[in-house]
């Protein structure tokens, strides 16, 4: 088991306002599998990623348990957040690669479909799609036991998105645990790469299961993802 949340509740208390963003969340991310979080804006998906990667804000108060085994790689929702703005993407990727012997920059870029001709560009001079792919490459270079990707294909055309999903699936098949946050159920259905879907609503896990299992659910919060 690469990671598990046990009855995790997260309250954000800034002193001016307080909000419960996660309530009694139970979640398992298994080795060798792709687990996908589905939900609307504000339903708590990114907060789950923050909990698993140690990125919860200082104002967060938690109860429950967060259990993580091994190294965790993270692909942020906005890929440019994975990079400093004052150095080229290539320089930063090479720095990451220098501490790890498993992945080379060339291999990581190929897996993420990041074009080699963009390596010399500053992050902000990449297109939205390019910098998102670069962020995937950066995460792979850390050789994580668990990869967490927050909307990794949101800025990509369909062909490139398929390629990134294929890379994610291959990484899981090599033994890693993968957690992906996405809104693109059509692409998810087309690839068939998800082993488990976890649907969230208002900070809670509604249900979890395979794509086929959830398609037959009677819960309206689940059915809406499979209608139309």
Features from the language model and the residues they span:
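Hydrophobic anchor residue at the start of the ABC signature
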Residues: 136
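Q-loop/switch helix immediately C-terminal to the Walker
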Residues: 78, 85-101
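Conserved ABC ATPase signature
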Residues: 122-126, 130
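C-terminal boundary and immediately downstream tail of ABC-type ATPase nucleotide-binding domains
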Residues: 199, 211-228
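Conserved catalytic motifs of ABC-family nucleotide-binding domains
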Residues: 143
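Catalytic Walker B motif of ABC-type/P-loop ATPase nucleotide-binding domains
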Residues: 147-151
């Amino acid at each position: 088991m690469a990671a598990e949340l046990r009855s995790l509740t997260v309250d954000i208390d800034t002193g001016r306002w307080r909000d419960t963003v996660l309530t009694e969340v139970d979640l398992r991310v298994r080795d060798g599998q792709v687990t996908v979080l589905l939900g609307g804006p504000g339903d708590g998906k990114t907060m789950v990623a923050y909990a698993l990667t140690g990125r919860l804000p200082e104002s967060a108060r938690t109860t429950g348990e967060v259990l993580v085994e091994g190294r965790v790689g993270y692909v942020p929702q906005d890929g440019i957040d994975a990079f400093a703005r004052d150095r080229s993407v290539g320089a930063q990727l090479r720095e990451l690669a220098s501490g790890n012997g498993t992945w080379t920059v060339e291999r990581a870029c190929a897996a993420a479909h990041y074009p080699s001709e963009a390596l010399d560009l500053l992050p902000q001079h990449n297109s939205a799609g390019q910098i998102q792919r670069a962020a995937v490459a950066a995460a792979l270079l850390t050789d994580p036991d668990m990869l967490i990707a927050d909307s990794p294909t949101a800025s990509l055309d369909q062909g490139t998105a398929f390629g990134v999903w294929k890379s994610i699936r291959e990484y899981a098949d090599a033994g890693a645990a993968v957690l992906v946050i996405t809104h693109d159920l059509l692409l998810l259905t087309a690839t068939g790469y998800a082993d488990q879907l976890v649907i969230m609503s208002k900070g809670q896990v509604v249900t979890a299961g395979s794509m086929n299992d959830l398609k037959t659910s009677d819960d309206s919060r689940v059915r809406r993802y499979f209608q139309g």
